[in-house]
């Protein structure tokens, strides 16, 4: 086969082991997954009710425009419906963005380490990837990213809060950054974890009307607890949305996914409860880190913590796994002596912390 040259050296995404597989290998009767930043509280009771009662005509294609969901989300953010695009998770939106803006003559700027799909999709398109190392505290080096932009740059990625460090860039700094980015360079502000930020930032969706080169990406996979439904969305100027719709598959979000997302976004009381629970979980890890001088906890603003214990990441990962907790080794994330741990329920956090204390 005459494969694209840009695929040479690239690997496919390797999902972690299934919980059942880990239990069988290690002889465990219970395993707690804290590796994929899923919501430990599940999803809204209203979503659960819909799942129990809903019937979907599986022989009928879904609404390709996601009309009902579009209306609800537009109303929630006080946006125009044409300022939204819905995709099969943010992963698909990232793919669409790289498809319309990158090729072998272009480059893209991003932090490192950050969400790996930016780099992966850019390389698939044959583009040059310009990675700017994070600052010592895990924050984006925004000045360094600005300096990396040239006439061939078409996309700049800003993951906020950043995955895997958890650092959050406040709105004033985002606006100052946007003021300096050339108007023909798209800034992707990936806010997959924005609902977890405490206190919640000022509403800023309408920045897209000031900055015509901005797209804000969000998801129903994290705090809304709909990871398996695969519903993400972008907020941008109508001209950007129009270009993305040219390459968007016609029926890319499912009927059930659209229905579940509608119920999920309506239940903001559940979202507030999740945010409070998550903030309390972060406090548990902060208290743990303060007790041990050798432990470095990166600023946590998502639903996960990145903890550097000064011990080889694989050792920490294996130790926790053998004791019934699946986490994410920092070795694959650019942090060789750290692990990323999803914030769980209070008792789960306490159990992991107790194990880490024994390891130290």
Curated annotation (Swiss-Prot):
It holds the Pfam family Aminotran_1_2. One of its GO terms (biological process) is L-histidine biosynthetic process. Keywords: Amino-acid biosynthesis, Aminotransferase, Histidine biosynthesis, Pyridoxal phosphate, Transferase. It catalyses: L-histidinol phosphate + 2-oxoglutarate = 3-(imidazol-4-yl)-2-oxopropyl phosphate + L-glutamate. SUPFAM superfamilies: PLP-dependent transferases. Its EC number is 2.6.1.9. It comes from the Bacteria. The modification N6-(pyridoxal phosphate)lysine is found at residue 222. Its cofactor is pyridoxal 5'-phosphate. Pathway: Amino-acid biosynthesis; L-histidine biosynthesis; L-histidine from 5-phospho-alpha-D-ribose 1-diphosphate: step 7/9. GO terms for molecular function: histidinol-phosphate transaminase activity; pyridoxal phosphate binding. InterPro entries: Aminotransferase_I/II_large, HisP_aminotrans, HistidinolP_aminotransfase, PyrdxlP-dep_Trfase, PyrdxlP-dep_Trfase_major, PyrdxlP-dep_Trfase_small. Homodimer. Belongs to the class-II pyridoxal-phosphate-dependent aminotransferase family. Histidinol-phosphate aminotransferase subfamily. This is Histidinol-phosphate aminotransferase.
């Amino acid at each position: 086969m005459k494969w694209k040259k840009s695929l040479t050296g690239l690997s496919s995404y390797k999902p972690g082991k299934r919980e059942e597989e880990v239990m069988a290998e290690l002889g465990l009767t219970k395993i707690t997954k804290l590796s994929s930043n899923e919501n430990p509280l599940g999803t809204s009771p209203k979503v659960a009710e819909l799942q129990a009662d809903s019937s979907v005509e599986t022989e009928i294609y879904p609404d390709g425009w996601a009309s009902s969901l579009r209306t609800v989300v537009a109303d929630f953010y006080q946006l125009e419906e044409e300022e939204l695009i819905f995709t099969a998770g943010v992963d698909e939106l990232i793919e669409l963005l790289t498809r319309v803006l990158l090729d072998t003559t272009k480059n893209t700027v991003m932090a490192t380490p950050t969400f790996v799909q930016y780099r992966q999709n850019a390389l698939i398109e044959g583009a040059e990837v310009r990675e700017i190392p994070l600052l010592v505290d895990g924050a984006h080096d925004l000045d360094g990213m600005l300096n990396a932009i040239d006439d061939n740059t078409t996309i700049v990625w800003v993951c906020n809060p950043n995955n895997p460090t958890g650092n959050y860039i406040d709105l004033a700094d985002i606006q100052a950054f946007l003021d300096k980015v050339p108007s023909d360079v798209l800034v992707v502000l990936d806010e997959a974890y924005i609902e977890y930020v405490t206190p919640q930032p000022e509403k800023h969706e309408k920045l897209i009307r000031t900055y015509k080169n901005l797209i804000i990406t969000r998801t129903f996979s994290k705090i809304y607890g709909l990871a398996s439904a695969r519903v993400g969305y972008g907020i941008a100027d109508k001209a950007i949305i129009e270009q993305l719709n040219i390459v968007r598959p016609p029926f890319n979000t499912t009927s059930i996914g659209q229905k579940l997302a509608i119920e999920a976004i309506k239940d903001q009381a559940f979202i507030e409860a999740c945010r409070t629970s998550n903030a309390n979980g972060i406090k548990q890890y902060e208290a743990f880190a303060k007790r041990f001088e050798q432990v470095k906890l990166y600023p946590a603003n998502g639903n996960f913590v990145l903890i550097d214990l000064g011990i080889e990441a694989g050792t920490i990962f294996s130790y926790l796994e053998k004791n019934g907790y699946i986490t994410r080794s920092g070795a694959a994330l650019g942090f060789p002596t750290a692990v990323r741990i999803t914030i769980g329920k209070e008792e789960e956090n306490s159990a992991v912390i107790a194990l880490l204390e024994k390891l130290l």
